[in-house]
Amino acid sequence: MAYKLLIINPGSTSTKIGVYEGEKEILEETLRHSAEEILKYDTIFDQLDFRKEVILKVLKEKGIDINELDAVVGRGGMLKPIEGGTYEVNEAMVEDLKIGVQGPHASNLGGILSNEIAKEIGKRAFIVDPVVVDEMEDVARLSGVPELPRKSKFHALNQKAVAKRYAKEHNTSYEDVNLIVVHMGGGVSVGAHRKGRVIDVNNALDGDGPFSPERAGGVPSGELLEMCFSGKYSKEEVYKKLVGKGGFVAYANTNDARDLIKLSQEGDEKGSLIFNAFIYQIAKEIGSMAVVLDGEVDAIVLTGGIAYSDYVTNAINKKVKWIAPMVVYGGEDELLALAQGAIRVLDGVEEAKIYK
């Protein structure tokens, strides 16, 4: 049976929605919200009714009867660290999303919006593989400073979706393979997937790992300390250097990887150096994750928007092909990944996990 699903993926200035019948998309809309609209609300949670009304209005205009839905799926937010999987939205989750236990983020509305709409029609609401998925082994958490443990914050939804896609296409299960998955977008995350669990991954939000179009990745800690206490920068300014204005933005004043690729292809000296450093750091991180997996790697999977570039993927492959074969799934399809997570539960392939 093809289940009819509403998928909700809230961003800071837009809400992306999709309606699926099974894995077939029958509607996709990006509902843009102006700065004026968003600024009316003091907190992200205060936007709930406004966003819900916009979603229901668009569905009505497009002739979608919400009473025909089998479930509603939201993007998971900044919850407590949890293992990967599909979770049924419950009161404990809604409360934690309201307060944002790991910080405010538009995705916190995903679970709440899906729950609100599902309650109206007496159906179930789910979230799938939020950014806070944490399956790291204890040995990977130590950083050298007890007060600064390493944290698992990465592109869990897309990493898990492409890992499962690889397993399916190779007639095996995600729980039977060892993969290194590299998501390359505004941030870069490199995860070691061992038998269905991401046992180590760089904190792609504001932690360690390769630099990216907008993020600094791992930086020399002594110099960072000097910068923090130099009196020249506020806390917010230093954070911006790490997230938002780091990486390509800092070196080349662009957050578009295509600009760097073009400079490199044209032989521009500075552009080539930045591009080569980007490739170098990703390859180095892949090598590090190969060690985490004891050298037992079935494949290296590249994904995210930057993986559309053969120039990038070929450059990485040149450095890491001795580790394992490379597979490329360019881009990311978060709506489909959310739909697939719910379908696995509705079909009885997986059980819905309980958030506590």
UniProtKB/Swiss-Prot annotation:
Q: Which GO terms describe its cellular component?
A: cytoplasm
PROSITE patterns per record:
ACETATE_KINASE_1 (PS01075), ACETATE_KINASE_2 (PS01076)
User: What are the protein's GO molecular function terms?
Assistant: acetate kinase activity; ATP binding; butyrate kinase activity
Q: List localization entries.
A: Cytoplasm
Name the pathway it acts in. Answer: Lipid metabolism; butanoate metabolism
UniProt keyword NADP present: no
Keywords from UniProt, A to Z, are:
ATP-binding, Cytoplasm, Kinase, Nucleotide-binding, Transferase
Is Cytoplasm one of the keywords UniProt gives this record?
yes
User: What InterPro entries does this protein's entry cite?
Assistant: Aliphatic_acid_kin_short-chain, Aliphatic_acid_kinase_CS, ATPase_NBD, Butyrate_kin
Q: Which SUPFAM superfamilies match?
A: Actin-like ATPase domain
EC identifiers of the protein: 2.7.2.7
Reactions catalysed: butanoate + ATP = butanoyl phosphate + ADP
- GO process terms (BP): acetate metabolic process; butyrate metabolic process
| Its job | Catalyzes the conversion of butyryl-CoA through butyryl phosphate to butyrate.
The UniProt family comment states:
Belongs to the acetokinase family.
User: PANTHER family under this entry?
Assistant: ACETATE KINASE, BUTYRATE KINASE 2-RELATED
Q: Which NCBIfam families match?
A: butyr_kinase (TIGR02707), PRK03011.1-5 (NF002834)
Task: Please state what the protein is called.
Answer: Butyrate kinase
Provide the species name. Clostridium perfringens (strain ATCC 13124 / DSM 756 / JCM 1290 / NCIMB 6125 / NCTC 8237 / Type A)
Q: Which gene encodes it?
A: buk
